[in-house]
Amino acid sequence: MGWVPDEWSIDHDTLIDAGGYVQKLKLYPYFDAAHYVLTCLSVRHDLGPDAISFSRKHPFSCWLSCMLMSFAGSFLSCFLLGEPIISPLKQHADILLGSIVWYLVFYSPFDVVFRLATWFPVKLGLSVLKEVQRTHKIAAGVKHAVRIYPESYLVQILVGVAKGAGSGVVKIVEQLARGTWHPTNHEILRPSFTTKACVIASIVFTLERHSMYVTAPHDLVYLCVVGFFIYFKLASLCLSVHDVLMPIENVLCAVFMGGIIDAFAKAVDATKKAIHSNRVLSEEEILSKEREKVLKKKKLLAQMSNGTDKKNN
């Protein structure tokens, strides 16, 4: 007998069926609505304590910011593939649902929708729905890029990442739409764990599409990626584990990005300075230092004599 009871065991076919079921879920309206709610909450949080006054004074700018962030992945992927950037707005049902969510988050009576959405159990459920939608977007982005650029793995990975984590890049444009801009704080310069996870998921889907190193059934791979996103999202919300890849990055950067070499160079320089400060001076260096002291004394005496002459005059 193992540690896990036999009743808890799940066979391979059941997991594949579960992955196929999750993959065929319709995102509209529930999963999309969860995405819009969390996006509007992110915009409102980014606005800070002036969010209410800003939404009253500049409603169009507030709406445009939320729409840019809600469809950021589609905007960015269209830009990368040379497709019309405005094409994500062709579905009026998506725009209508996003606008309704935006209105409720910013203008609901007594701010009841915002308070309900930020309540931890509700936010937890919305986050799970959004991670399922994120996986669907990454898989769809890789599939679309494979159809257009079948020989370019880099393009396929980039489009998948853009679909899953495009809001971090488009955030610069969104900030311009509401009159603020922070050029030193964007996703390319400081990628979040979500972007890193999207890169990993996009690589997995790309390799699986080409049957390279990932030979498991597509439905099983899809289910594993969904579980990967949900697990780390719950860990971030419940346990405040925000970036599990940071220790690995620090080690890799120290080994392959010059960290060890730079530390060794600093140690050598410090050793040289210590040796130079503690070594015995030669006779010439001692004589030169004595001459410098004598010259300094002569200059001081000359200055003092000049001062006394001026006083006597």
Swiss-Prot record:
The keyword Endoplasmic reticulum applies. A 1,2-diacyl-sn-glycero-3-phospho-(1D-myo-inositol-4,5-bisphosphate) binds at K130, R134, G168. The chain crosses the membrane at residues 29-48, 58-82, 91-108, 119-149, 152-178, 193-210, 217-239. GO terms for cellular component: endoplasmic reticulum membrane. It is a multi-pass membrane protein. Residues 1-28, 83-90, 150-151, 211-216 are lumenal. Pfam families: TRIC. The keyword Transport applies. Residues 49-57, 109-118, 179-192, 240-313 are cytoplasmic. GO terms for molecular function: identical protein binding; potassium channel activity. It is found in: Endoplasmic reticulum membrane. Keywords: Endoplasmic reticulum, Ion channel, Ion transport, Membrane, Potassium, Potassium channel, Potassium transport, Transmembrane, Transmembrane helix, Transport. Belongs to the TMEM38 family. Potassium channel that mediates transmembrane potassium transport. Might be required for maintenance of rapid intracellular calcium release. May act as a potassium counter-ion channel that functions in synchronization with calcium release from intracellular stores. Binds phosphatidylinositol 4,5-bisphosphate (PIP2). PANTHER family: TRIMERIC INTRACELLULAR CATION CHANNEL (PTHR12454), TRIMERIC INTRACELLULAR CATION CHANNEL TYPE 1B.2 (PTHR12454:SF18). Homotrimer; trimerization probably requires binding to phosphatidylinositol 4,5-bisphosphate (PIP2). This is Trimeric intracellular cation channel type 1B.2. It comes from Caenorhabditis elegans.
